[in-house]
């Protein structure tokens, strides 16, 4: 099996991926190993509880949220090619003074942290964007997801995996903890166009808009309903785990707009969650939409902007887009 480092050399030769991007990806991989180690020892070190404060999202921070964020930020501050970082856990972007890096790093350092003390799967999500020439500031991060140079996630589960794309397919690597190396175990991941599996938080059903109500009702009706086939529902409450299932087994993942989040545009963060995952899903042959437009075409208005998310099997996402075409996108 190929080591991650060997695979990245191949990418440089076959697709002319910039070597600076590849170096950054290797540093991100090492960072994810460090985060995995902190999670593994979390209970033994007393780091499974709350950090005693809220993040900019108004969510309670776990101690491991803060630790993971510090690990990512420390790596980026030393990485010569990173000019600035933005994190779901930080109110503002951090620009590294005196650095002339070509890239911006965006990350959710610990996705699904509410699951960490239950010993369920959690993850880290990252995205690499081009830095503008000249000075870098917070506005530099407000780029459409289609401009991402690379994106990926680490999944901390029964094994630690790194799944990434540099715009030439999606590939999964599994960590050998004894050697400290990621090996290519899931080359060329793809999402089947059709599926009988959906992932959504059904407890929010009464708040959904009519198109999603209709779609889920048809799925639940199964073989006796208009779809003529039975569906299974899944829900982990960790986006990394949900998207990983899409890439490995297929399906569709929904975190739609609901009546409580209309003013915010949705629940999931565009820069830290929706964009990197949308790039992965599209590179695997799936689709990703807000219901009204392609997620990767959304122009961010702020670092912590939120959007509705529906992604996965092409036929299902197209159906959801069709159902949304009869509704007002501003409602």
Swiss-Prot record:
One of its GO terms (molecular function) is magnesium ion binding. One of its GO terms (cellular component) is cytosol. It is found in: Cytoplasm. Binds 2 magnesium ions per subunit. Pfam families: FBPase (PF00316), FBPase_C (PF18913). Its EC number is 3.1.3.11. Mg(2+) 1 binds at residues 88, 108, 110. CDD domains: FBPase. It is an enzyme of class 3 (hydrolase). Keywords: Carbohydrate metabolism, Cytoplasm, Hydrolase, Magnesium, Metal-binding. Mg(2+) 2 binds at residues 108, 111, 273. Pathway: Carbohydrate biosynthesis; gluconeogenesis. HAMAP family: FBPase_class1. Homotetramer. This is Fructose-1,6-bisphosphatase class 1. It comes from Methylobacillus flagellatus (strain ATCC 51484 / DSM 6875 / VKM B-1610 / KT).
């Amino acid at each position: 099996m190929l080591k991650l480092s060997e695979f990245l050399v191949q990418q440089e030769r076959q697709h002319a991926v910039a070597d600076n991007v590849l170096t950054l990806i290797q540093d991100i991989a090492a960072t994810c190993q460090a985060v995995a180690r902190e999670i593994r020892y979390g209970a033994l070190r007393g780091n499974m509880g709350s950090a005693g404060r809220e993040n900019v999202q108004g969510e309670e921070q776990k101690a491991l949220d803060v630790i993971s964020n510090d690990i990512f930020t420390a790596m980026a501050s030393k990485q010569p090619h990173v000019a600035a970082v933005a994190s779901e856990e930080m109110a503002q972007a951090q620009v590294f003074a005196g650095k002339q890096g070509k890239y911006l790093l965006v990350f959710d350092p610990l996705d699904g942290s509410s699951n960490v003390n239950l010993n369920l799967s959690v993850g880290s999500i990252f995205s690499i964007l081009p830095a503008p020439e000249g000075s870098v500031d917070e506005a530099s991060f407000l780029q459409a997801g289609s401009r991402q140079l690379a994106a990926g996630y680490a999944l901390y589960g029964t094994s630690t995996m790194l799944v990434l794309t540099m715009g030439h397919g999606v590939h999964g690597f599994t960590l050998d903890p004894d050697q400290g190396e990621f090996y290519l175990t899931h080359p060329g991941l793809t999402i089947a166009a059709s599926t009988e599996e959906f992932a959504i938080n059904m407890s929010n059903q009464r708040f959904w808009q009519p198109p999603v109500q209709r779609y889920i009702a048809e799925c639940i009706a199964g073989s006796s309903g208009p779809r003529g086939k039975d569906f299974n529902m899944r829900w982990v409450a960790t986006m990394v785990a949900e998207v990983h299932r899409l890439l490995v087994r297929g399906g569709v993942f929904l975190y739609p707009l609901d009546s409580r989040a209309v003013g915010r545009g949705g629940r999931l963060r565009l820069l830290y969650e929706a964009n990197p995952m949308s790039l992965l899903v599209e590179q695997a042959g799936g689709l990703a939409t807000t219901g009204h437009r392609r997620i990767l075409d959304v122009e961010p208005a702020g670092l912590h902007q939120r959007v509705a998310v529906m992604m996965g099997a092409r036929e299902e996402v197209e159906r959801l887009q069709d159902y949304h075409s009869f509704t007002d996108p501003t409602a």
